[in-house]
A protein has these predicted regions:
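ER/Golgi luminal nucleotide-sugar-dependent glycosyltransferases, focusing on the catalytic module
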Residues: 1-206
Length: 206
């Protein structure tokens, strides 16, 4: 399986170095690329030995995955992760089939109407507009949040084309985590949770 690991990073810290070390340990044959999402602090990139590409707007994860596919569109599969996900063991990438996604996700929701409204706005003119609107229940817009996943080429291409309205700030990124969760679960045959293979580090990054 020809695998590319894409790491989305913003204002990177030592977490990025630890993430890279884990990828190299558990996926030694995979290629790696970092997509930066308009960082103010980039000093950590001087310590890495993989390509770093700069996306000069705050499109966060989905923008990173889209740019990576534009630059590296010929891989069999893509491990798309945030730089705060530290690998703990190897995913069975060889068993990934064309109608399957392995995803790091949690079940959570919005507590404010404006974030739910933003999710609906971001899906305007897409095939997911009606279903996102339907999932909005009172003040609690509850969906699985997917922002990191192992995905076959064809499914990543589909998501990028099906969700063209990219987020431009952190609030938009929060909304898009829910939108991606909905799009992934509705577009593949099965979703396998990969949380056990990563340690999520939480910080105060903006």
């Amino acid at each position: 399986l020809n695998l590319l690991t894409v790491i989305c990073s913003r204002n990177p810290t030592k977490d990025l170095i630890d993430c890279l070390e884990g990828i190299k340990q558990f996926y030694p044959d995979a290629d790696i690329a970092i997509i930066d999402s308009d960082s103010d602090a980039t000093e950590v990139y001087r310590s890495v030995d993989v390509p770093v590409h700069y996306l000069k707007n705050k499109n966060y994860e989905l923008g990173a995955w889209k740019l990576a596919y534009e630059l590296y569109g010929d891989y069999d599969a893509y491990l798309c992760i945030q730089d705060t996900l530290i690998p703990q063991n190897r995913l069975p990438v060889e068993t990934l089939c064309c109608d399957q996604v392995m995803s790091y996700f949690n079940i959570t929701g919005f507590k404010y109407d404006d974030l739910a409204d933003l999710a609906i706005e971001l899906t305007e003119d897409t095939i997911y507009h009606d279903v996102v609107s339907k999932h909005r229940i009172s003040e609690d817009f509850r969906l699985a949040t997917h922002n990191s996943f192992l995905i076959p080429n064809g499914k990543l291409s589909y998501l990028i084309n099906a969700l063209p309205n990219l987020p431009v700030d952190k609030r938009g990124s929060m909304a898009y985590e829910r939108i991606l969760g909905l799009a992934i679960t509705q577009s593949v045959g099965s979703v396998i949770r990969m949380n056990h293979s990563f340690n999520k580090r939480h910080g105060s990054r903006q």
